[in-house]
From Swiss-Prot:
Residues 23-83 are annotated as: Disordered. Adult male abdomen. This is Male-specific opa-containing protein. One of its GO terms (biological process) is sexual reproduction. One of its GO terms (cellular component) is extracellular space.
Length: 83
């Protein structure tokens, strides 16, 4: 790592540590836990949806091309070069 990358990393860590941390005791209760259990009752059997039709049979897997998988190897587009 060069000096600029180390300096940026140091600044990011310092900013993350300097942020005030929230106290979990002061956070409000989640709404799902506050809801009464009767609200989550199951619908009656008459209102249930009909079962879905069966899925069509899966197609046979295709063989890989003779030259390999066809994908380029050793390519990383997520590299950022500084300097």
């Amino acid at each position: 790592m060069n000096f600029i990358q180390i300096a940026v990393l140091f600044v990011l860590v310092a900013v993350a540590l300097a942020r005030p941390q929230e106290d979990p005791a002061n956070l409000p209760a989640p709404e799902a836990a506050a809801a009464p259990p009767a609200a989550a009752a199951a619908p009656p059997a008459a209102a249930a949806a009909p079962p879905a039709p069966p899925a069509p049979p899966a197609a046979a897997p295709q063989a890989a091309p003779a030259g390999g998988s066809g994908r380029k190897k050793n390519v990383n587009h997520n590299v950022i070069t500084i300097g």
